[in-house]
A protein has these predicted regions:
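Fe(II)/2-oxoglutarate oxygenase catalytic core
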Residues: 1-162, 168-194
Length: 194
């Protein structure tokens, strides 16, 4: 299935300013660190082709319940809706999944992957927009760059800044070579592609 909507203005959008202050980032970090951590899986987790694969991904994650940080969810969804209206143009977009707190230690990475099932076998709602928000101060780690396979885009985010991109774009987090990288990952979905 090829996505046919909409006529694109852009596939990738960075916020011009941070969405969260350093204090707000620390609140999200504290929440993420307090929750049950799990070794991150690849390829739809427990589904065929999925599971834990240290050749493709080394990081721990935790899931932040909606009820624990409603203001965070409200602010990020509002920003996504603006980005969708100004750039993506999808119909019926909404927050559909809880946020993933990701914690990359030195040596942690996530190889090239997509965030949606382009064949639509496991959905709706269909993931259409992915977001990464950098929680760490970039001065506290080296490496860990987010690369998106679209015009060789490398995101150089400030603390609290977010990037939104089409969920079917291949992307990766390069290995962290020093320090720790903490980020918030979210997905937004809607009805199946037309």
């Amino acid at each position: 299935m090829n996505p046919t909507e909409p006529i694109w203005k852009s596939y990738i959008v960075e916020t011009t300013q941070p969405i969260f202050t350093p204090k707000q980032c620390q609140m999200v970090i504290d929440k993420g660190m307090s929750l049950k951590k799990e070794t991150a899986a690849v390829g739809m987790g427990q589904r065929p082709g999925g599971g834990i694969d240290p050749k493709k991904r080394i990081t721990t994650i935790s899931w932040i319940p909606f009820k624990d940080m409603p203001e965070m969810y409200r602010d990020i969804e509002a920003t996504m809706l603006k980005a969708n209206g100004n750039h993506f143009g999808f119909e019926g977009m909404r927050l559909t999944e809880v946020a993933q707190f990701t914690h990359y230690l030195t040596g942690g990475f996530y190889d090239w992957h997509m965030d949606n099932d382009v064949l639509g076998k496991h959905e709706p709602p269909v993931r259409k927009i992915s977001m990464t928000l950098l929680l760490s101060d970039p001065a506290t780690f080296e490496g860990g760059e987010l690369e998106i396979m679209s015009k060789d885009k490398t995101a150089k985010l400030k603390q609290g800044q977010a990037i939104f991109f089409a969920s079917w774009l291949q992307h990766r987090v390069k290995p962290v070579t020093k320090g720790e990288r903490k980020s918030l990952v979210m997905w937004f979905g809607g009805p199946s592609f037309k």
